[in-house]
């Protein structure tokens, strides 16, 4: 297939061919013996004056980076750590070295030898004595003053975004540090990290539509996991008392500013604890990460958040009563609930025409958007919580909470069902919902039922969407901005 190139791209390709003709193919370079990073170089010499550096017997260093700017005999290179000014004096270098410098294009990756100097403006600079091209840029970088601002291009060509936008690079550095700190904190609390299968033959662990694939050798249908829950609870049955997994989850659902079909979650399970223990653990974990990384006061979706303040706690029914004036504690039948849904114009699907789904629909319709400060919402209806232990005081509800911040859910936690008979009945109820059109209903997982029949201690479980947490802590309103390579629609032709 014939490719078309711009005039600038053709010039660069001609430069490359000239180098090859001179036996100077930059792509034959296999490594660069760098003395240090650009940041370390700047740090090492920043406290010396221009005169001191000039009079010192300095050792030559080898640096490397991408050329991102040129002005006469000055240039700017960058590596992962920082940017650095370079200078080449035509009078004091071999003519071939100077010729190499003048032939460089913006975006080229170079190896440089030289010594430290400072300019009249006191800027640390590498006084170049030798230069070698180690990778040729055949594409033109975005103009440096305006950068790369098209959000579509930034997401599709993240590598380009990372080259030219420090803000984007810093977001992904913070993402890495957030996950590292999450792992460090859990390890310090006595948790064991485990790995569970991505391919699963039973659909369970969450309410979500799956991606489906086929295992050729076994001639069997598998799902890409929609949660790690079931496998982790089997670990609790097996005797682990604190386990977690940070891993990829796949849900074949819509995409918007807070949803991507492939995302990262952390799930953890603790034996012998209840919902309230997990609630405190959740708050402690998030606050620890935010404190450690100095991210306690982010801005998210236009709201300022103070993660240093104690998180609020409220029952779902109390919140509905507060915002709508409907007290579902007093509703005694599905029929009553349906009348209330009709009165308040709450839309329901066929499988949602029961007390529990209606309570949940009221909450999602009228309350979620009011929850700005970090708030633990507990007391979900049993019909929307098939893996959660029933509340002993009112079995229409379960011991579950979700954490909401700035109108969005960030965490979901349960007191886990450990009664295999109850769990079996919940799975059967899910099958009935599937018949009514609920394509997010769980399947009957008899292998998990059998595991529970061996005995699982009272257990608290938690799931946190890592991507959404990163969005919050880095003040990003779109999930695409915190995923290195988000899923995108095909380009318009």
UniProtKB/Swiss-Prot annotation:
<dbReference type="InterPro" id="IPR006195">
    <property type="entry name" value="aa-tRNA-synth_II"/>
</dbReference>
<keyword id="KW-0963">Cytoplasm</keyword>
<feature type="binding site">
    <location>
        <position position="402"/>
    </location>
    <ligand>
        <name>Mg(2+) 1</name>
    </ligand>
</feature>
<keyword id="KW-0648">Protein biosynthesis</keyword>
<dbReference type="GO" id="GO:0000287">
    <property type="term" value="F:magnesium ion binding"/>
</dbReference>
<dbReference type="GO" id="GO:0006430">
    <property type="term" value="P:lysyl-tRNA aminoacylation"/>
</dbReference>
<dbReference type="GO" id="GO:0005829">
    <property type="term" value="C:cytosol"/>
</dbReference>
<keyword id="KW-0479">Metal-binding</keyword>
<dbReference type="InterPro" id="IPR018149">
    <property type="entry name" value="Lys-tRNA-synth_II_C"/>
</dbReference>
<protein>
    <recommendedName>
        <fullName>Lysine--tRNA ligase</fullName>
        <ecNumber>6.1.1.6</ecNumber>
    </recommendedName>
</protein>
<keyword id="KW-0436">Ligase</keyword>
<dbReference type="InterPro" id="IPR012340">
    <property type="entry name" value="NA-bd_OB-fold"/>
</dbReference>
<dbReference type="GO" id="GO:0004824">
    <property type="term" value="F:lysine-tRNA ligase activity"/>
</dbReference>
<comment type="subunit">
    <text>Homodimer.</text>
</comment>
<keyword id="KW-0067">ATP-binding</keyword>
<dbReference type="Pfam" id="PF00152">
    <property type="entry name" value="tRNA-synt_2"/>
</dbReference>
<feature type="binding site">
    <location>
        <position position="409"/>
    </location>
    <ligand>
        <name>Mg(2+) 2</name>
    </ligand>
</feature>
<dbReference type="InterPro" id="IPR004365">
    <property type="entry name" value="NA-bd_OB_tRNA"/>
</dbReference>
<dbReference type="InterPro" id="IPR045864">
    <property type="entry name" value="aa-tRNA-synth_II/BPL/LPL"/>
</dbReference>
<comment type="similarity">
    <text>Belongs to the class-II aminoacyl-tRNA synthetase family.</text>
</comment>
<keyword id="KW-0030">Aminoacyl-tRNA synthetase</keyword>
<keyword id="KW-0547">Nucleotide-binding</keyword>
<dbReference type="InterPro" id="IPR004364">
    <property type="entry name" value="Aa-tRNA-synt_II"/>
</dbReference>
<dbReference type="GO" id="GO:0005524">
    <property type="term" value="F:ATP binding"/>
</dbReference>
<keyword id="KW-0460">Magnesium</keyword>
<dbReference type="Pfam" id="PF01336">
    <property type="entry name" value="tRNA_anti-codon"/>
</dbReference>
<dbReference type="InterPro" id="IPR044136">
    <property type="entry name" value="Lys-tRNA-ligase_II_N"/>
</dbReference>
<feature type="binding site">
    <location>
        <position position="409"/>
    </location>
    <ligand>
        <name>Mg(2+) 1</name>
    </ligand>
</feature>
<dbReference type="InterPro" id="IPR002313">
    <property type="entry name" value="Lys-tRNA-ligase_II"/>
</dbReference>
<dbReference type="GO" id="GO:0000049">
    <property type="term" value="F:tRNA binding"/>
</dbReference>
